[in-house]
Amino acid sequence: MFRQEQPLAEGSFAPMGSLQPDAGNASWNGTEAPGGGARATPYSLQVTLTLVCLAGLLMLFTVFGNVLVIIAVFTSRALKAPQNLFLVSLASADILVATLVIPFSLANEVMGYWYFGKAWCEIYLALDVLFCTSSIVHLCAISLDRYWSITQAIEYNLKRTPRRIKAIIVTVWVISAVISFPPLISFEKKRGRSGQPSAEPRCEINDQKWYVISSSIGSFFAPCLIMILVYVRIYQIAKRRTRVPPSRRGPDATAAELPGSAERRPNGLGPERGGVGPVGAEVESLQVQLNGAPGEPAPAGPPDADALDLEESSSSEHAERPPGSRRSERGPRAKGKARASQVKPGDSLPRRGPGATGLGAPTAGPAEERSGGGAKASRWRGRQNREKRFTFVLAVVIGVFVVCWFPFFFTYTLTAIGCPVPPTLFKFFFWFGYCNSSLNPVIYTIFNHDFRRAFKKILCRGDRKRIV
């Protein structure tokens, strides 16, 4: 978003330009090089070609990965959950960074001056801050959505409609715009010590101390702090609910941990529709929900415990299944509903055995419960393993976010308070921040089976017609 140059007059710096021989102007101007000769490029031909190739690969990888995310969400039924609209909006922001920002940053870097005129300079600066800030705020919104879906369980999942998600996305873009547009409103033209315009056209953003500090807080430090606190809280909840083995939990204790988990809802979100019974299964589904990346839905009803998710009823209800499996499910599903209809309003719900993992699973009798000790122990060990994997996912999500953006925003803030930062180091941190746009598709999809399956169908020509 911002680039540093050699020290400028009045403590300003050039946010987008490359190292320049003149260091006295903090505004855009269109004067020619002294003597009317050709401008000297800041890099040799070999270095320039290397930079162009690296930046070109970054742009291609960013566009390709994020386009795959968008296509997968809109073509795969298993990914049509409302919360996946966050991923679509995030991918769109990253694509815009790669197409409308990085190319001009690259040209400005290798040419050593701004070639594209004053009007586009101001638009470019605003778009740069807007798209990069939007990408970061999207990650923060995804973490909050995940936290609410866990702490409020069924209640929030019922409210998580496409309209609500779209409203949150609009809010994300509005916040990003509020952070991005002040530079245009308070854009000042400064001159060097001599009062003369510089020899090269330059494109620089507002370098006032108040804006540097406020934009750094709004664009990075505040969202980063929110993400870290939210994910720490999510991990604490998961750790507390998996510390005690299911054999030591009572039905009442388990039901009390998640609001609304002990009673059947009039909308059908009970055990028949992917909800879980009051014997510890809901806690296990919570843990598996945490095991995925933010915003990812779980596949519907497979036997694998990793696929259990409290959000099944709203996210993966239409997950892909072989044609024969749909017909074979009608019998057990109908039987399960018939048994549920026989439960009177005052009766307690039947307890589920340890093997009940999917939709319409049969209830367990006393004999099954007595022989289920080994299965419970196995599931307990599975939950411990999932907790470790969940820790790894959190480390990836938070670690990559901080590693990509913290160095830039930290050094950017240092320049506002007068601390000198080596220009080469600042440039490296600036481009390293752009890498986050290309890594988002990897971070938020590599741990999700539905995305991997959708990507395979998109990339394999023979299977394209079978995408559902």
From Swiss-Prot:
Q: Is Hydrolase among the key words of this record? A: no
Q: What is its main location?
A: membrane
Chain segments annotated as transmembrane: 49-74, 86-111, 122-144, 165-188, 208-232, 393-417, 428-448
Bilayer disposition of the protein = Multi-pass membrane protein
Q: What is this protein called?
A: Alpha-2A adrenergic receptor
Specify residue ranges for compositional bias: Basic and acidic residues.
315-332
Residues linked to a glycan: 25, 29
Disulfide bridge positions per record = 121-203
> What are its GO cellular component terms?
cytoplasm; dopaminergic synapse; plasma membrane; presynapse; receptor complex
Q: What PANTHER family does the record tag this protein with?
A: ADRENERGIC RECEPTOR-RELATED G-PROTEIN COUPLED RECEPTOR, ALPHA-2A ADRENERGIC RECEPTOR
The organism that produces this protein has a lineage beginning with: Eukaryota, Metazoa, Chordata, Craniata, Vertebrata
Q: Does the keyword Transmembrane apply?
A: yes
Q: Which InterPro entries match?
A: ADR_fam, ADRA2A_rcpt, GPCR_Rhodpsn, GPCR_Rhodpsn_7TM
Q: Which UniProt keywords apply?
A: Cell membrane, Disulfide bond, G-protein coupled receptor, Glycoprotein, Lipoprotein, Membrane, Methylation, Palmitate, Phosphoprotein, Receptor, Transducer, Transmembrane, Transmembrane helix
Q: Give the family per the record.
A: Belongs to the G-protein coupled receptor 1 family. Adrenergic receptor subfamily. ADRA2A sub-subfamily.
